[in-house]
Structures are given as C-alpha cells and as structure tokens.
C-alpha cells in the first residue's frame, strides 16, 4: 500500500505505525518479537493446552483473555498484541536466534526471503565499507612463539552491536565480517535442494600436520551421538591431487586439521587453492587452520553449503582444543553458527572463528530436539544454581518448546536462556544424563558424559 510513512495495515482496518521513535528497523524488530511471544502464549489454548513458562511470566501483567483471543482471526489477535506496551513483555521474549545485517544492494535482495523464513531481525548497514582490524598481539605471540610489535591487520566489515539479546549474527554483503556469519545467497539456495535420508553421516577427517595429530580423536567424538550412524574416514598427509579428489566426492562433513597460508591449504607436495575448484560435494566443513577464511569461501563458492573458518592466525594448541570442542558440539546437534557461539567464551580472546555460507546447518539431531548448554552459577553440597540455555535447529525452530521434567509439566520456549533452576544432585544428574551437554563451571568447560553431580557439588 502506497503512503508517506511505513505502517502495518490489516484487512479489518487496524493500522500500526512502523516508523516509531526508535526508527523503522528497530520498530519492525520489536513488532516481530512481541507478536511472536504473545501468539505463542495464545496458542497454549485450544485442543492441546500447554503449561508455558512464558505465559506464567506475562499473564498477570496483561488485561488479555487468551482463551477468547485463541478463537479470534489473526488480524484481531495482532491488534491486541500491538496494544500491549513492548516494555511490559520485553523480559519474557526469548533470546532471538538470528539478526542479519544486509548491505542494501540489489545483489543482497535475494537473501531476504531466506532470512525472513528464519524469522530473523533484519537491519541495513549505512556504512558497510571494510576497515582494518588488528589481531591482538597475545595471539600472534602464542602462534609465533616470540614477541612481536607488528600485529596483523586485515580489512573486515564490523557490524554494529545488536541492542537486544541475540544468539546469531549474520552479514549479507561482499566483504568479510567480524564476529558474524557471512551468508551467501547461493549457499542458501543450494540448501533447499538437500533432502534428508537415512544413510550414515559421512565425515572425512583430514590431518595434514603431524604436530596436530592429537586432534584426530575427533573421530570418536563425532560418534558419541547414538541416535545416528556415522561413516568416518581418517586421512593423513593428503597430496594436492588426493585432497581435490576427496572434495569432489559426496560427503556430509570435512574436518580439516593442518595449515593454510596465502597460497592455499598446505599439502605435502604443495598447496590446494580452493578458489580454483569448480565442483565441491562436501556439504559442510571445519577448516581448523590459520586464517582460513578465503579457502573456506572457496569451498562455499564451489558447492559447499557452509562451514567454520578462522579469521586470524591461531596457535596449534588453541586450534586443537577448539577442534575437539567443535566436534562435540556438532555431534550434540548444534548448528555451525551456534557451535561458534558456545565456543567463543572458551578460547583465547582475539582468536576468532566464524561461519561462512549457511551457518544454520546442523550435522545431526540432538536427543532433546534442541541442543542444551548449562552454566553452573553457584553450588553447595545440596544445590546447583543452574542456568539452562537452548538453541534452535533446522528441525526445531522458533516456537519449539522443551520440558526438563524438573518442575512438573512446565514447558519453555526454545532459544537462549530459559531460566535458572536450583537443582538437587539427583535432578542435576537427570539433566546431565539426558543428552551430551557442554557444562561451564568456574571458568572451566566440562561435558555431561564425563561428569556427574558428585564431581560438581
């Protein structure tokens, strides 16, 4: 509908101004998040009623008859939702799974249907010009093993911070971003052609650096998810021709351990430059090597759907530790993007990993449907004060609910921090036994299949 100001208009005549005090993009983002929350609350009515935690939080604040609203047309529901002050319900809105910054060009427009389908909050970038970013000296010193006064400088786009709690941050545009998933339209399109099947998940683990062979144990970590069958092959010191041939074969995932330099992926007999490849049939990948962004983009442009790469030089010890955690996170059902999110707090500051292509891909399903993440905030002999977070996946997106059987039948909307719980030792063990979960306590990272409440309390 033509007009001087952006607005939302329903077929019943209701009009809502989208050019609010916070500006158009901020207002649209608020409308999306507020409408989502309140419609989820309304949908707890009907034939299959749900005891929803978020309804308990907001119902007493609102003068809304949700039982009556359930039977009303969507336009009437929307008018009711937007009659509520955003601040009244803001603290009950789930952490948003994805915010996408879009370079406002014609080429970027084709990405909009995909990010809208993910219910992402979309922003345009007024100044997307890449700027120099310096790698922290500590990382370079660790990598080189000597002091240096010359930090490495690379040009990246630095998206503006998001003003609300968001888990994933993505960028659509030409230049590489800092701390965001570089989406590409072609990788999103190719993802539509992927049909799930019952065949084993095929993974190639390639180690082209004998000094990093400790990371080869990842082959065991990928198989910890007993809901799936895995076909894992190990490869060491692949030649350029052998590596090129491997990438041409159909596979679900490549975990590369080794080195990348300006000429490409380092092989015993030279370099494999992925930007020269015409056909890659590995769906997703982890290039756990120094400054692997360009080679990762080469894989995506040649056919991969998405992957995890590094932006700077990474010390071998840090890369090995990160590779082991990535394998566990992906096997636990995390997407490429949420794997990076969960890992970021547990590597040296400045050593940055990011995703390229479709960062919303997952390798397999979590036992819980949505992968979990636990933070033990405080403990004593009888109680663990625990924060539980969860994340959306391609199969269990926004609107999914979880029940922990901790407090009867209460369910929680998935995405981000759900709540804090005071758990007894037996309740904590029940949570730890239910799935493979990363657990953070006193600045250390544990895994639920390696510990019990007795180790923590």
Positions of PLM-derived features:
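A domain-level signal for caspase-like cysteine endopeptidase catalytic cores
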Residues: 97-253
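Catalytic cores of nucleophile-dependent amide-cleaving enzymes
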Residues: 256-338
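Long terminal accessory regions outside catalytic cores
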Residues: 1-118
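Caspase-like cysteine protease fold
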Residues: 271, 334-457
């Amino acid at each position: 509908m033509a007009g001087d100001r952006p607005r939302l208009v329903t077929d019943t005549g209701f009009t809502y101004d989208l050019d609010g005090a916070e500006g158009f993009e901020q207002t649209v983002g608020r409308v999306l998040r507020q409408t989502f929350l309140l419609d989820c609350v309304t949908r707890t009515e009907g034939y299959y009623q749900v005891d929803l935690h978020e309804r308990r939080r907001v119902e007493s604040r609102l003068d809304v008859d949700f039982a009556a609203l359930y039977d009303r047309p969507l336009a009437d529901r929307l008018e009711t939702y937007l009659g509520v002050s955003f601040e009244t319900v803001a603290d009950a809105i789930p952490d948003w799974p994805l915010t996408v910054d879009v370079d406002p060009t014609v080429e970027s427009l084709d990405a909009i249907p995909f990010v809208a389908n993910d219910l992402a909050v979309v922003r345009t970038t007024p100044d997307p010009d890449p700027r120099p970013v310096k790698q922290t000296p500590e990382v370079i010193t660790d990598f080189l093993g000597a002091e240096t006064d010359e930090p490495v400088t690379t040009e990246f786009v630095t998206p503006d911070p998001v003003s609300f709690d968001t888990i994933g941050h993505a960028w659509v545009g030409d230049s590489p971003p800092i701390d965001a998933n570089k989406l590409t339209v072609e990788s999103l399109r190719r993802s539509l052609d992927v049909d799930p099947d019952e065949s084993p998940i095929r993974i190639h683990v390639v180690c082209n650096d004998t000094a990093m062979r400790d990371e080869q144990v990842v082959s065991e970590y990928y198989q910890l998810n007993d809901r799936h069958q895995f076909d894992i092959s190990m490869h060491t010191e692949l030649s350029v021709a052998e590596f090129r041939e491997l990438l041409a074969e159909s596979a679900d995932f490549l975990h590369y351990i080794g080195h990348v330099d300006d000429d490409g992926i380092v092989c015993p007999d030279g370099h494999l430059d992925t930007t020269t490849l015409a056909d890659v049939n590995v769906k997703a990948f982890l290039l756990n090597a120094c400054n692997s962004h360009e080679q990762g983009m080469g894989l995506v442009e040649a056919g991969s759907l998405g992957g995890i790469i590094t932006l700077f030089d990474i010390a071998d010890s840090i890369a090995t530790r990160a590779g082991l955690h990535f394998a566990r996170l992906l096997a636990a059902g995390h997407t490429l993007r949420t794997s990076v999110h969960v890992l970021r707090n547990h590597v040296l500051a400045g050593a940055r990993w990011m995703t390229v292509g479709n960062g919303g891909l997952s390798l397999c399903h979590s036992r819980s449907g949505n992968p979990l993440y636990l933070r033990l905030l405080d403990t004593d002999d009888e109680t663990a004060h625990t924060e539980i977070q969860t994340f959306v996946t391609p199969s269990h997106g926004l609107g999914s609910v979880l029940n922990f059987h901790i407090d009867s039948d209460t369910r929680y909307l998935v995405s981000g921090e759900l709540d804090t719980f005071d758990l007894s030792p037996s309740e904590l063990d029940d949570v730890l036994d239910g799935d493979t979960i990363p657990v953070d306590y006193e600045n250390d990272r544990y895994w639920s299949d390696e510990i019990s409440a007795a180790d923590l309390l």
